[in-house]
Amino acid sequence: MDSISVPLQFCLMRVQEAVPGKPHFSVERLLIRVTYSDERISHPIGNPEA
């Protein structure tokens, strides 16, 4: 989990810098989609956001 935590945070920061005009919720959605799809491959998880 630690190995994926840093890249995700870095990606989130990069996305926020790349699209400052976009609403913050869309950035969180993107992060959740990436995290969920990646976590699904490793181990199943329930709704992270619900």
Curated annotation (Swiss-Prot):
It comes from the Eukaryota. This is Putative uncharacterized protein DDB_G0292498. The lineage of its organism: Eukaryota, Amoebozoa, Evosea, Eumycetozoa, Dictyostelia.
